[in-house]
C-alpha cells in the first residue's frame, strides 16, 4: 500500500495484526482517518493514540461503531491532546461511551480550539454525561460548531445545559438531539436558549423527541428570528394540523430562508397540507420537503400538486411515501412531472397507485418538459401491465437517472420489457432498483449481461 495518500478510509473490516501493522504508518500522516466498524480494541486505541501524537496533519478522525468504551475513548483522546493537533472533525458515534467517560471528553474539548464537529450519537451518555460535556463546550477555548447527540438517553434535564451552550457560543451552527425523550418541556427550554443566543444556527434536528403542537409556537419564533436556519427536522413528532398552523407563520416570515423541512409521520392531514402549501407558494428558498407517513390522502396530493405548478414554488425534492394516495391523484402528479421545471426527486413509494396511476405518471414523464431525475415507486401495487408504459417512458425521457420499482409484481414479462428499453443507447437511466421482485434464472442472466454491456447502469436487487 502506498503511503503517499491523504485519506485512510476502512469500513466493516476485521483487521488482522499484519494488516494493522501496515496501517499504523498511515495513521501518522493522513489528514482523514476513518476506521468504521473495524473491531478496534483497547490495545489498538493505544496504537491510535501514539500515532495521533505525531500527526499534525490530522483534520478528521472517525471511529464510529467500534466498542471502544470509556477506557478506549480515553486513550484516543490522549493522542489528540498534542499541542500540534489541529483536528476539525471527531466522530465517536456508537463507541460504547458512557456518562462516566464524558469528564475526560469535556477536558479534551478545552484543549482543541480547532475542533468544529463532534459526533456522539448512539452512546448512552445520559443527563449526567451531557452535563459534563457541556462544561467543556462552555470553555472559551472550545469553538465547536456542530454537535450530534442522537440516541444518547437524554431527557428534558439535558436541555438546560445545552441551552446554556447555545447562549454562550456565537459560532454554533448545527444541533442534533433526535431520538431522545426531551419532550415538550425540554424543547421549550432549547427554544428559549436559541431565542437568547447570538448563534447563526443552520440546522436543528429534533426528530422523535416528543415535540408537541404547543412547541410549534416556540419553533415558529425560532424559524422567524434565525435567518441563518436552513434545515429543520421534526419527523416522528405529534405536531398535527394544529402544530402546522402554529409553525407556518414562522416559515412565512420574510427573514426565513429555510431550505429543508422534514415533517414525516407528524399526524398531518390534508388540512395541515393546505397551510403548508401557502409556505411553498411564498418561499422559493424551500427546496426539500418530507411529508412521508402523513395521512394526506388524494385531497392532500391535489393541494400539493396545484402548489407545485405555481411559479413561486421551487421545490426540488418531495418525499410523500406512505401518504394514503391512490390512482385518483396521479393525474395531478402527471401534470407536475410534465410542467414543473424544478422538481428533481419524487419519493412516492408505498401508495396504492396501481397500474392505472403509474400509467398516468408515465404520461407526464414522457413529455419533453419533464426534468425529474429520481423516482421511487416501490410497493405501489404495480404489475407487469405497467411495464410497457414504463419502458416507453425510459426511452422518451432524457432526464430520469434513477428509478425504484422494488416490491412490485413485475415478473419476467415486465422485467424483460424494462431491460429491452434500458439497454438502448437512448436510455440515460443510471440506476434501476428492483428489490424484492422475483424472476427466473434466465432473467437473472439477462440482467447481469445488461450491466456488463452498459457499464453506466447499475441494477440493484
Curated annotation (Swiss-Prot):
PTM annotation (Phosphoserine): residues: 91
Pfam family, one: LRR_6
Segments for region (2 X 5 AA tandem repeats of S-L-D-I-Q): 2-11
Gene Ontology CC terms, in alphabetical order: angiogenin-PRI complex; cytoplasm; cytosol; lamellipodium; nucleoplasm; nucleus; plasma membrane
One GO BP annotation of this record: cell migration
Cystine connections: none
Coiled-coil portions: none
Localization (cell): Cytoplasm; Nucleus
PANTHER family, per database record: NACHT, LRR AND PYD DOMAINS-CONTAINING PROTEIN 12, NACHT, LRR AND PYD DOMAINS-CONTAINING PROTEIN 3
Descriptive protein name: Ribonuclease inhibitor
Species, as recorded: Pan troglodytes (Chimpanzee)
Amino acid at each position: 500500500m502506498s503511503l503517499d495518500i491523504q485519506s485512510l478510509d476502512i469500513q466493516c473490516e476485521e483487521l488482522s495484526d499484519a494488516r494493522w501493522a501496515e496501517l499504523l504508518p498511515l495513521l501518522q500522516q493522513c489528514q482523514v482517518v476513518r476506521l468504521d466498524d473495524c473491531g478496534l480494541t483497547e490495545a489498538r486505541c493505544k496504537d491510535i493514540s501514539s500515532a495521533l501524537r505525531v500527526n499534525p496533519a490530522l483534520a478528521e478522525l472517525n471511529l464510529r461503531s467500534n466498542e471502544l468504551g470509556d477506557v478506549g475513548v480515553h486513550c484516543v483522546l490522549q493522542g489528540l491532546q498534542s499541542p500540534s493537533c489541529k483536528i476539525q472533525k471527531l466522530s465517536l458515534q456508537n463507541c460504547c461511551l458512557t456518562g462516566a467517560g464524558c469528564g475526560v471528553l469535556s477536558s479534551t474539548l478545552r484543549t482543541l480550539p480547532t475542533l468544529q464537529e463532534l459526533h456522539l450519537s448512539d452512546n448512552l451518555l445520559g443527563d449526567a454525561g451531557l452535563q459534563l460535556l457541556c462544561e467543556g463546550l462552555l470553555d472559551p477555548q472550545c469553538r465547536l460548531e456542530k454537535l450530534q447527540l442522537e440516541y444518547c438517553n437524554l431527557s428534558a434535564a439535558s436541555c438546560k445545559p445545552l441551552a446554556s451552550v447555545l447562549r454562550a457560543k456565537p459560532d454554533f451552527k448545527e444541533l442534533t438531539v433526535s431520538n431522545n425523550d426531551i419532550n415538550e418541556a425540554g424543547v421549550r427550554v432549547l427554544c428559549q436558549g436559541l431565542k437568547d443566543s447570538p448563534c447563526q444556527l443552520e440546522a436543528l434536528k429534533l426528530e422523535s423527541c416528543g415535540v408537541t403542537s404547543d412547541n410549534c409556537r416556540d419553533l415558529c419564533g425560532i424559524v422567524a428570528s434565525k435567518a441563518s436556519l436552513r434545515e429543520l427536522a421534526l419527523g416522528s413528532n405529534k405536531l398535527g394540523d394544529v402544530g402546522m398552523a402554529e409553525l407556518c407563520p414562522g416559515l412565512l416570515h420574510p427573514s426565513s430562508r429555510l431550505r429543508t423541512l422534514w415533517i414525516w409521520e407528524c399526524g398531518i392531514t390534508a388540512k395541515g397540507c393546505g397551510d403548508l402549501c401557502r409556505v411553498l407558494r411564498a418561499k422559493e428558498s424551500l427546496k426539500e420537503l418530507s411529508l412521508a407517513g402523513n395521512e394526506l390522502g388524494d385531497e392532500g396530493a391535489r393541494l400539493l400538486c396545484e402548489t407545485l405548478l405555481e411559479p413561486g414554488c421551487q421545490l426540488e425534492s418531495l418525499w410523500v411515501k406512505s401518504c394514503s394516495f391512490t390512482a385518483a391523484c396521479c393525474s395531478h402528479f402527471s401534470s407536475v412531472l410534465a410542467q414543473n421545471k424544478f422538481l428533481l426527486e419524487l419519493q412516492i413509494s408505498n401508495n396504492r397507485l396501481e397500474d392505472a396511476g403509474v400509467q398516468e405518471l408515465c404520461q407526464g414523464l414522457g413529455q419533453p418538459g419533464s426534468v425529474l431525475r429520481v423516482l421511487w415507486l416501490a410497493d405501489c401495487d404495480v404489475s407487469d401491465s405497467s411495464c410497457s408504459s414504463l419502458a416507453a417512458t425510459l426511452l422518451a425521457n432524457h432526464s430520469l437517472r434513477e428509478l425504484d420499482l422494488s416490491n412490485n409484481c413485475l415478473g419476467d414479462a415486465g422485467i424483460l420489457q424494462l431491460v429491452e428499453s434500458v439497454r438502448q443507447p437512448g436510455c440515460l437511466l443510471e440506476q434501476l432498483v428492483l428489490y424484492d421482485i422475483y424472476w427466473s434464472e434466465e432473467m437473472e442472466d439477462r440482467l447481469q449481461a445488461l450491466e456488463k454491456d452498459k457499464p453506466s447502469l447499475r441494477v440493484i436487487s
